[in-house]
Amino acid sequence: MTREFSLENTRNIGIMAHIDAGKTTATERILYYTGRIHKIGETHEGASQMDWMEQEQERGITITSAATTAQWKGHRVNIIDTPGHVDFTVEVERSLRVLDGAVAVLDAQSGVEPQTETVWRQATTYGVPRIVFVNKMDKIGADFLYSVGTIHDRLQANAHPIQLPIGAEDEFNGIIDLVEECAYMYGNDLGTDIERVEIPEEHKELAEEYRGKLIEAVAELDEEMMMKYLEGEEITVEELKAGIRKATTSVEFFPVICGSAFKNKGVQILLDAVIDYLPSPLDVPAIKGTLPDTDEEVERKSSDEEPFAALAFKIMTDPYVGKLTFFRVYSGVLNSGSYVKNSTKGKRERVGRILQMHANSREEISTVYAGDIAAAVGLKDTTTGDTLCDEKSLVILESMEFPEPVISVAIEPKSKADQDKMGTALSKLSEEDPTFRAHTDQETGQTIIAGMGELHLDIIVDRMRREFKVEANVGAPQVAYRETFRAAAKVEGKFARQSGGRGQFGHVWIEFAPNEEGKGFEFENKIVGGVVPREYIPAVGAGLEDSLKNGVLAGYPLVDIKAALVDGSYHDVDSSEMAFKIAASMALKAAVSKCNPVILEPMMKVEVVIPEEYMGDIMGDVTSRRGRVEGMEARGNAQVVRAMVPLSEMFGYATALRSNTQGRGTFSMTFDHYEEVPKSVSEEIIKKNKGE
């Protein structure tokens, strides 16, 4: 099978946004216009093609990023629909890693919302070029230029409209194309009656003003165009398009377009923009990797001629074919039935079949080429973030880093039969989702599951019931507290046991000090003159690491600490690794009285959107939850309160907000950072953990 679409004509894009901005509907319409779907499914009727898990259809939100392939004007567009709900940030991180470009969907009424900021930040981290699609222009309160303003204010992004809407709300019936200087008028809401016309007289002035601004903004990033512009020469449509494309692919400029996916307006023009302005795999820098043995940095270019290299970015369990591994091919070609090396794990894998996915149906293909996104059946050891490559030309592509879970609950099966199934279910689910963890608490024997938020864990429990038929009881949520030291001190740990025959002896002096936030644990060996023999030094580090898991105040993990081994002594016969391990953990316990240990708690960035009249109640409520209000602003006819609130105080907030605002308020929260717990709260936590 030869290559159907050239690399230049391939686009790998993600569709990202805040919850409810209309991403899934936009993706649906793209699939519809590119001939992949015969009937359109509406998200709010629960029949969308991309949302194929039952819970997604029930809740009307997208949880797993379905990858699907579409064709438009001789190009192949691979689309990954990502969830906008904050608990599923990992899905977004994962898909951005393998994309070349993205479409950020905004709601024309609200503009940039909190989750948009999070996703935008992630896209900036991975250097992903973006187009902004201001959706829902048919909604009451839709305001295109306000939305563009929020991109400048909240994202500090160099974004400029390349289109303007004609009318808004019920009157939204056309789009002005500032690049081609024409307009498209819609005769109905089905997207079937579109007419290309001249820009209507009453909109000409505004269109000229914004076209001028657009040319100026693009010229600033392109010297040749700047010269022409300053000399007053005409800039052709082709030159302007090339300028926008160059500036967009180098992530210096973000074109903004508008439409209403629900009313089938602007979707075809969105597809044109994806092809005109977003990069092909050839336009983005070659992916970097390292050689497994030497850690030497190498590049893999987007080309079929290079050795095969791909990144697995998602694992899914499929009821019919078992485990599906979604991967992005960066270089080379892969045939089904062939063997590859998983260089991250050092394992050989056989690729049984290769499937090209369309939201929930699939077609089997025999070969994938550089730039493709597909799913493999038959991989046994591969997990998210692993590199698959040619056995003769090994490389490890840069992997992805995932955030630590911030919330955990105890879970127990309802019956003995559920007990065994639960183990299988949890291991499969944690294979699919790196931010979900399951472990057994050594002291209580309970199974603990941990994740990124209440909704995340709700959905995990729900999936256990549906997909694995496991019924389980869930305990109250627990916060993932941490502990750390605030002061430095030098402490001694000495372990000596003499009981006939061979004894045990280990003796260390360790200097503990606070580390920078987020730096974790750092161990340094400062021993001179061999007072502690070299072979015991790793044991001291290991002893400390083991003890860090259960902190000194209330048993929470100790983080962000430096430890330096500065002195000690040993015994020729009685010293052993074990003895030094124990001595190190004794030193850590002794540090409690000297290093001023404190408890840290996860702080959430909360944004509450409410009608004006509830402002007082909500501010009072935030303060009563130990929250700090960080800012307020009017958004349309609603008020937005931004605050930093401890996660422990946010449980059940959705219910409280509903009753405080008669169901008219909404909120979103994202994990922001860890912060020291006030003394009174800290005492409560310690008491509770000691079972007093």
From Swiss-Prot:
This is Elongation factor G. GO terms for biological process: ribosome disassembly. PROSITE patterns: G_TR_1 (PS00301), G_TR_2 (PS51722). Keywords: Cytoplasm, Elongation factor, GTP-binding, Nucleotide-binding, Protein biosynthesis. Belongs to the TRAFAC class translation factor GTPase superfamily. Classic translation factor GTPase family. EF-G/EF-2 subfamily. Pfam families: EFG_C, EFG_III, EFG_IV, GTP_EFTU, GTP_EFTU_D2. Residues 8-282 form the tr-type G domain. SUPFAM superfamilies: EF-G C-terminal domain-like, P-loop containing nucleoside triphosphate hydrolases, Ribosomal protein S5 domain 2-like, Translation proteins. It is found in: Cytoplasm. It comes from Bacillus cereus (strain G9842). One of its GO terms (molecular function) is translation elongation factor activity. GO terms for cellular component: cytoplasm. Catalyzes the GTP-dependent ribosomal translocation step during translation elongation. During this step, the ribosome changes from the pre-translocational (PRE) to the post-translocational (POST) state as the newly formed A-site-bound peptidyl-tRNA and P-site-bound deacylated tRNA move to the P and E sites, respectively. Catalyzes the coordinated movement of the two tRNA molecules, the mRNA and conformational changes in the ribosome. GTP binds at residues 17-24, 81-85, 135-138. InterPro entries: EFG_II, EFG_III, EFG_III/V, EFG_IV, EFG_V, EFG_V-like, EFTu-like_2, G_TR_CS.
